Every structure is written in structure tokens, then in C-alpha cells.
A protein has these predicted regions:
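Beta-strand elements of repeat-based all-beta scaffolds
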Residues: 1-228
Length: 228
């Protein structure tokens, strides 16, 4: 059973369920209940401001809206004027904050997330929403930077880690990744059928022996993986 408000938003869902309880010295007991989804409270702009945990009720009132709230504090979300979440506070009062800035030198949007343990990660994205760089700013070894490069049609072709190690990817005309060159594991290659299903995979070690991992399908459903 789903209840919606005047804007068509689902505000409560009820489902049949079973709760099993047991106490010391007694056997487990099953009870048929209705599981009531946690209620959402919206702000003036229709955004979920508070999300409550689910609760339960008896089976005889499935068609009646349950106005009660769970005793656990709700998850509280704060937004900026662009509807982006800037703060999420969980029931245990731990808070994750998100700041949005612009890096004028690279013309990228920088999204900086700070979790409840004060771990900080900054993500740089371009106008297409592609991630160009991530920086973990609070690791024990200082900043850890990973950079991403794309070709003219926005396919990921190059990843550079904080040590300068480079992983490259090659694609065919169907935008299917045919080769990954990793500095540690070497070259891994893939072949595909006309429908885009992976037919073979060959790692650097298998290539030395001229062997492949092959894949079987039944109407595009994977049915088997064959190792040499």
C-alpha cells in the first residue's frame, strides 16, 4: 500500500512482514505485522529535509495512514540554492558536509566532501560531468591524487595515480573497451560479439601461453565462463 501527497510524491509505503522476537528462556515467536516505511518530511521546495526510520504496526490498519514517527532521530539534509546537498546528519549525529567551488585555473567544478571522521576528498569535474581529478586530502601519506583523461567522445583513455603510474584504455568503433594496459598487471584484451557481449578475455599471463578466458551466452544471458 502506497500513500502519496498532493504532488504525487510517495510519503509512506506499507508491506506485509514478519517480526521474530525471542527472550531469554523462551522460544522464538513470529508476529505478522505491517512494515511502515520511514516518513519523509519535505522543505518548501519539495526536497527531502528529514528522513525517518521505518516502523511497524498491526495488520488491521493497512489502509490508514500512519502518522507516528520512529523514536530514532531522522536523517537531516540541508541544501544550497542549486538543490545540492551541503550537509547530511545521520541519527547518530555524525555529519558529512559537501562544498561546491570553481577552480578557475582548470575551469572545473570542485566538490569537496568531508565525512564525520574529517576525511576530505575533492573531486574535479568538467562541464560534461566527467571526473578529471580526485584528491584525498587527509590520508596518512598526505594528498593522494588520481587524474583522468578522456578522448574526443568522452571515453576514459588514461588514468594516472599519485605515483605517476599510468593505466590506458583502447576502444573499438562500437565504444567497447578492447584493451587495458596497467603498469602492474600488463595488457588485458577483450573481444566481443556483434551484440556487445564479451567473448574472450586475455590477461598478460595468459597471452604468454596463447590462452584465453571465454564466455558463453544464451540469448545474451551469460551461461558460462571457461578458464584455460
Amino acid at each position: 500500500v502506497t500513500f502519496v501527497d498532493g504532488f504525487g510524491r510517495a510519503v509512506q509505503v506499507k508491506k506485509d512482514g514478519v517480526v521474530t522476537s525471542a527472550s531469554k528462556g523462551n522460544s522464538a515467536k513470529d508476529e505478522n505485522v505491517m512494515i511502515v516505511s520511514g516518513r519523509n518530511m519535505y522543505d518548501a521546495f519539495g526536497r527531502v529535509a528529514k528522513a525517518f526510520y521505518p516502523t511497524t504496526e498491526g495488520t488491521g490498519s493497512k489502509s490508514t495512514f500512519n502518522k507516528s514517527f520512529d523514536n530514532v532521530s531522522p536523517t537531516v539534509t540541508v541544501y544550497d540554492v542549486l538543490d545540492r546537498a551541503t550537509s547530511v546528519t545521520l541519527p547518530d549525529n555524525s555529519t558529512t558536509t559537501t562544498a561546491y567551488t570553481v577552480d578557475n585555473s582548470s575551469h572545473t567544478l570542485v566538490t569537496t566532501v568531508t565525512d564525520a571522521l574529517h576525511n576530505v576528498q575533492a573531486t574535479h569535474t568538467n562541464g560534461s560531468g566527467k571526473t578529471l581529478k580526485t584528491i584525498q586530502k587527509s590520508g596518512p601519506d598526505g594528498e593522494i591524487t588520481t587524474s583522468f583523461e578522456y578522448d574526443g567522445i568522452q571515453r576514459l583513455v588514461r588514468v594516472t595515480d599519485t605515483e605517476g603510474n599510468v593505466t590506458t584504455s583502447t576502444y573499438d568503433m562500437g565504444d567497447r573497451r578492447t584493451e587495458v594496459n596497467h603498469p602492474a598487471s600488463g595488457i588485458t584484451s577483450f573481444t566481443y560479439d556483434a551484440l556487445g557481449n564479451v567473448l574472450t578475455k586475455q590477461t598478460a599471463n595468459l597471452a604468454k601461453e596463447g590462452k584465453f578466458i571465454t564466455y558463453d551466452y544464451d540469448y545474451q544471458r551469460l551461461t558460462g565462463i571457461n578458464y584455460p
